[in-house]
Design a protein with these regions (language model features):
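Zinc-dependent deaminase catalytic domain
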Residues: 1-145
Length: 145
């Protein structure tokens, strides 16, 4: 009999599915925000709504980073704001480690736990912010089964 998914595996698998909506061909990133094991928002990286996406008009690169995109974490945070969902104490499941700006926003929004799969732009100050704010960070390896 197949082993049942843990909650972390379950929600991270959802983030990986959400990432498939990304319009970026450089990195498809997905995020799922939960409170008490209930999904309150999802997000993926892509252009500003109503404007051209990378897959339509190309990348706008600065310092090796595409500035056209809104990151998955930010889209999920903004979805919470639009729909009136408080994030205090929330967990975010994200396919890639949050960049510095996303880490600052997650800390400010009250996220207390980040579960991710892939390392990405592991900024030392992002890690320090998480430590100082008491945010638990978990890297979840892909199951071998």
């Amino acid at each position: 009999m197949k082993k049942r998914l843990s909650w972390d595996e379950y929600f991270l698998a959802q983030a990986e599915l959400v990432a498939q909506r990304s319009s970026c061909d450089r990195a498809q990133v997905g995020a799922v925000i939960t409170v008490d094991r209930s999904v309150i928002a999802t997000g993926y990286n892509g252009g500003v709504a109503g404007l051209e996406n990378c897959d339509e008009d190309g990348h706008k690169l600065e310092d090796g980073h595409c500035i056209r995109t809104v990151h998955a974490e930010m889209n999920a945070i903004l979805q919470c704001a639009r729909n009136g969902h408080a994030m205090n104490g929330a967990t975010i499941y994200v396919t890639h480690y949050p960049c510095l700006n996303c880490m600052k926003s997650l800390a400010q929004a009250g996220v207390k736990r980040i579960v991710y799969r892939n390392d990405y732009r592991m900024h030392a100050f992002a890690e320090e912010i998480a430590r100082l704010k008491g945010i638990k960070i978990v890297r979840l390896e892909r199951s071998k089964e």
